[in-house]
Amino acid sequence: MKSLIDNMINKTMKLNSLLLKQNIIKKNIVNLKSFKGYNSFSSSTISDKVVVTAALNGVLTDPAKFDIPVTPEEMAIAASEAYDAGASVVHIHFRDQRPGKGHLPSWEPADAKAISDAIREARPEILVNFTTGTIGTGTSPLAGGKLGPTDGPISCLEAGMPEIAALNSGSLNYLKATRKGTWAWEPLMFENPVEKIEIMLNAMCKLNIKPECECFDTGIVRSIKMFESVGLMEQPINLSLVMGVASGMPCKPEWIELLKEEMNEATQWQVIAIGREDATWPTLRRAAELGGHVRTGLEDTFYLPNGERANSSGQLIENLVKIVREVGREPATPEETRIILGTK
């Protein structure tokens, strides 16, 4: 018996040595089993339910040109409308609250807390999902540009304590060309190296915030399985297919089945469809048909299925819920969503 135990110990030591050489085991390595919702999802009980998320405002749209919510009061109203239409989650970005500066992002913890508090006061049931994406540094006007790329987002997570937060899971050249053959904006790099991903994962784990892995391209989808294989992530994993960014994967329904093949079966996934109505709505319908979850809102599109301009995220959610029911499924309640996504 002693020799058997010694043999097992030797094998374990060799394995740990190998993992350390590969820089996988670290002091603060994330273990998603620490989330209180680990293994709480039973596919046999609520597998027909669809998590419907409302993306209320985004980071790029100018409120002077488009009617998007900026202030805590406006965000609370938009969240209430989306909830009443059938959304169980709201995904939010923070905008500069100074007069005339609402077109700029904010990483002020006070802004994040004020917005999330207003939403929770208006609709205590709804799940709040924070953005964490930065291009360059996570700077804030009041910080004097001294923050690093994760400092602002982490400070906002600590202040607002959402149940879910976006985890941008790979880098992307963020590009768009005009019909005239010029750049719509100066080419940008949306940098999300593994080191940054680890930092954000560790922060979310410590705060008991569930990561939602944002995948803008096919290689990022495939990377999630690699993160899992090396121990950086563990199931249950929540994954978002961000479809329609000009330099990412296209918003095409036929892509979804191929992308599903690159996920582990236990992964919970949703489609975020960006663009005009001829691309977004068929893609969202296909996602619902294939068992996925879905997201829409003024961050993702301004257009209803008939091509008319939407007045609010609530109006977009109303149309999305109609599609969910047309394919024979039902939107999940907030309580069901917490079970499905493993936040409870």
Language-model-derived ranges and their functions:
Residues 1-34, 41:
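N-terminal mitochondrial targeting presequence
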Residues 42-67, 169-184:
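N-terminal small/glycine-rich loop or linker at the start of catalytic domains
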Residues 58-74, 134-147, 186-190, 270-276:
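Active-site mouth loops of central-metabolism enzymes
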Residues 89-112, 242-243, 303-305:
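Glycine-rich, proline-tolerant flexible connector loops at the mouths of alpha/beta enzymes
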Residues 102-130, 200, 259-266, 320-322:
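Alpha-helix-loop-beta-strand connector modules within alpha/beta enzyme cores
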Residues 112-191:
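Active-site beta->alpha loop and helix N-cap motifs at the rims of alpha/beta catalytic domains
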Residues 164-298:
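Catalytic alpha/beta core domains of metabolic enzymes, predominantly
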Residues 306-325:
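C-terminal helical cap(s) of enzyme catalytic domains, especially alpha/beta-barrels
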